[in-house]
């Protein structure tokens, strides 16, 4: 056997198992996982046109981030996978916990409270019906 054949076997196995669904990921979004999930739960399983309408009129801050991310996933589906927009729907959407920025808030009598500014990683995966 040739030298380095294990890496070649692993590379071939990874190519076979590669996920071909169009997706987009937003890392280090300055919104907490809980607040992002409120918006993601509203669009999960919907077709992309309906989801864009829901996001356009949703007053939450996370909806503007997710709307931009969804448009990116739609563009990936069109350009990279050659899928038509009419048949696309949101198969998976989830938010994972990211790092937390810790800040100090001065309080009375020399005390200090910790403020945690939470981040999340938001992922949207589309598929065709």
Predicted regions mapped to residue ranges:
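Ribosome large-subunit tunnel/peptidyl-transferase-proximal elements
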Residues: 2-95, 119-129
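Strongly charged
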Residues: 98-129
């Amino acid at each position: 056997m040739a030298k380095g054949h294990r890496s070649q076997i692993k590379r071939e196995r990874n190519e076979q198992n590669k996920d071909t669904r169009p997706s987009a990921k937003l890392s280090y979004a300055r919104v907490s996982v809980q607040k992002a999930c409120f918006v993601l739960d509203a669009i999960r399983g919907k077709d992309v046109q309906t989801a864009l309408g829901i996001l356009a009129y949703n007053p939450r801050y996370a909806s503007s981030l997710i709307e931009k991310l969804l448009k990116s996933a739609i563009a990936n589906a069109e350009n990279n996978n050659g899928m038509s927009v009419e048949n696309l729907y949101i198969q998976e959407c989830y938010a994972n916990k990211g790092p937390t920025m810790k800040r100090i808030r001065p309080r009375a009598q020399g005390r200090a409270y910790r403020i945690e500014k939470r981040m999340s990683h938001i992922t949207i995966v589309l598929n065709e019906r």
